[in-house]
Amino acid sequence: LSNYEIRSRYPNFYMSLYDELLRIPFLITGPGITSKKITRPIRTIDIFPTLFDILKLSFPSKIQGKSFFNLFTQDDKNPDPCFIHTIPYEKPSKYDRVGIRTPNFKYFRNAKNKNEDVHLYDLINDPLENKNIANYENTKVMQMEDILSSITSFTTNIEKENIDEEEEQKIRDELKKLGYL
């Protein structure tokens, strides 16, 4: 088996940030929408503004994200990096990872410790993400960490509300029904 095939057999693989787990198909069709395959990653934060753009509605400025509707007619030479994060855990986990993906590189690391489990992949020369070059490309790792830090600086730490056990169980049951737990 190749490295690519071997890692898919790891017990915690579903908690990774490799492209085979991140890439999902997304289809938009309708009047005035040109048929085109967009191969670069699209940020989920940009879907809502794109739908507003397609419907010719004004987009509230306080909401983050940018329309990618123009990608149907032209190429984006400078796309924003995509923030990537493993599935959030109910309790802190050593497997939690955060990172960013650009057209040329992917960088991710432990969510709590920026020096732990650091990965950097050159997606042009290694599209299957087999060779982690983080130990050889310190400057690039620092650049990617700076980008990641600027993205995560906008997030806030939300304190868990104090809810009783009965309410917490109801929430758990609903999440189970929806397939999240």
Where are these regions (language model features)?
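Catalytic domains that recognize anionic headgroups
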Residues: 1-181
